[in-house]
Amino acid sequence: MKSNSQIKGVSRGFTLIELIVGIVVLSLSFSLLITLILPLSEKSAEQLHQVRASELGQSMMNEILARAFDENSDMAGGLVRCSEGTTDCTSPDENDFPHLGPDDSETRQTFNDVDDYHGYDSDNTDDENALNEKFSSLYPGFRVQVSVCYSEFDGVCNTTSVELAKLIIITVTTPQDFDFVFSFYKANF
């Protein structure tokens, strides 16, 4: 007759069925874990892109608001507004000159009034900031588009006459192709 210690010594290890059940349980737990974590990582990137788009939109808004209302405005103290007296504001008509948009050889670094940003698209240029850092390296995959038009504070662009305010619309597109739209007014004062 064999002792208990001899019987225990013979029955060491796992059976084939126990190994298969262990592999199945492990694979099910990994698949469940991946199913739960993978969507969270995508959401994490989406939230990061939302924050970066907000930063970029706010930065462009601050840059544009720091400019004069119009090319024909008094840029030395703002005592005389365009459309008062003998100075007309820039025409909203694309066929007139000067019209909304950058002047002949202006670049983003030399924009001096709000409507110079009309038609700006970061895909068409690789601008640098004041620290000589390229836009494409600071915000890879992002795109900024700017539209400027005259408006009566109603959110509607007026393309036929000069108004007391310009509506600026900034659209920031993230690498995941989500558009974030920022709109604000610059008044003629």
Residue ranges, per PLM feature:
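A general, composition-driven signal for non-globular sequence regions
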Residues: 6, 46, 137-139
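Short amphipathic alpha-helical leader/targeting segments
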Residues: 2-4, 34, 41, 47, ...
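N-terminal leader/signal peptides at the extreme start of proteins
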Residues: 1-14
